[in-house]
Regions:
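C-terminal segments of enzyme domains that contribute to small-molecule binding surfaces
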Residues: 1-6, 12, 104-148, 178-235
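Flexible, glycine/small-residue-enriched loop-and-beta-strand segment within the central core
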Residues: 4, 15-151
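Active-site-proximal glycine-rich helix-loop-beta segment
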Residues: 92, 161-162
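Glycine-centered loop/turn positions within well-structured domains
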Residues: 104, 163, 167, 171-173, ...
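Catalytic-loop signature of eukaryotic-like protein kinases
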Residues: 138, 156, 173
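Beta-rich strand-turn-strand
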Residues: 147-157, 166
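Conserved G/P- and acidic residue-centered "switch" motifs that form tight phosphate/ATP-binding loops
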Residues: 159, 177
Length: 235
C-alpha cells in the first residue's frame, strides 16, 4: 500500500506507512505516520508519532507528540511534548501540554529559555517542558479545552468544552470549568474497574470491527464483562 504527499507539502526525515496521507501545505519533520494516518492542510509536525488511522485535521501545530491509533483531532489542535492514547476524540481549538512559565523567578519572560531575543548566552535557565503531560485512552476532549503541563487525564475521561485542566483527572470522570473540576463519574465503580481491566483499546482492529454492536451498547457490568471476555481471548 502506498502513501500520499501533496506536492505543496514538505516532509523530511519522516517515515510514512502504507495508506498515510499528507494534505496541502504541511510541514512535517522527523516524524512517523502509521498505516492510514492522515494530516490535514497547513499542519506542522515535528518529532511526532501518529498511530494507525490517527487523523489530524487542518491547521494543527504539534511538537514531540505521540498519538495512539484511531485518535482524531479537530481543526487548530496544538500539542507540545505530550503523549496521547488510543481511540481519543479531540475537538477543535484544543491545546495540550503548552509550556510553563516559572512565575517563582524574577521574570516570566521567554528570554530565560529562548535565544530569539538575543539576551540568553548558553543553555536555557530551565526546562519549560519538564513536567509530563499524558492523555489516556478513549478520552473525549471538547472544543476550546486546555490541558496544562504536569497533568494526567485518565482512561475514559471526558473534558468539557472550554475547560482548563490544571490537575489530574481520574479515569472515566467528567470534568468541566475553569479551573476544571469533577462533575461526575461516567459509570458505576464496578463497570469502570472492568473497562479499565479489559484494555479494549489494545484489541486487534478486526476484533473491534466484528463486535461493533457490543461496543455501541450502554455501558454496564454485563457489557463490560463481555468486553473482558474478548480481551482474555485476544490479548
Amino acid at each position: 500500500m502506498t502513501y500520499y504527499i501533496d506536492p505543496s507539502s514538505t516532509v523530511k526525515d519522516t517515515k510514512l506507512c502504507g495508506g498515510a496521507k499528507v494534505y496541502k501545505n504541511c510541514n512535517i519533520i522527523s516524524s512517523r505516520l502509521g498505516e492510514g494516518a492522515l494530516v490535514g492542510d497547513f499542519s506542522r509536525l515535528s518529532d511526532c508519532t501518529l498511530g494507525e488511522k490517527a487523523s489530524i485535521q487542518r491547521y494543527a501545530l504539534m511538537f514531540n507528540t505521540k498519538i495512539g491509533r484511531y485518535t482524531y483531532t479537530g481543526r487548530n489542535f496544538t500539542s507540545w511534548h505530550c503523549e496521547i492514547g488510543k481511540f481519543c476524540s479531540i475537538s477543535w481549538n484544543v491545546s495540550i501540554g503548552g509550556a510553563n512559565h516559572d512565575y517563582s523567578r524574577i521574570t516570566t519572560h521567554a528570554f530565560l529559555y529562548s535565544a530569539d531575543f538575543g539576551l540568553l548566552d548558553g543553555e536555557p535557565e530551565y526546562n519549560r517542558f519538564s513536567d509530563a503531560c499524558i492523555i489516556g485512552n478513549d478520552v473525549w476532549i471538547g472544543c476550546g479545552a486546555t490541558v496544562c503541563r504536569g497533568v494526567t487525564v485518565g482512561d475514559g475521561a471526558v473534558v468539557a468544552a472550554g475547560a482548563v485542566v490544571t490537575k489530574n483527572v481520574e479515569p472515566y470522570t467528567i470534568v468541566a470549568g475553569v479551573p476544571a473540576k469533577p462533575i461526575k463519574k461516567r459509570f458505576d465503580e464496578e463497570t469502570i474497574r472492568l473497562l479499565i481491566k479489559s484494555r479494549w483499546w489494545d484489541l486487534p482492529s478486526q476484533v473491534i470491527k466484528d463486535n461493533v454492536k457490543l461496543f455501541s451498547q450502554k455501558a454496564d457490568k454485563n457489557a463490560a464483562k463481555k468486553i473482558i471476555e474478548l480481551s482474555e481471548k485476544h490479548l
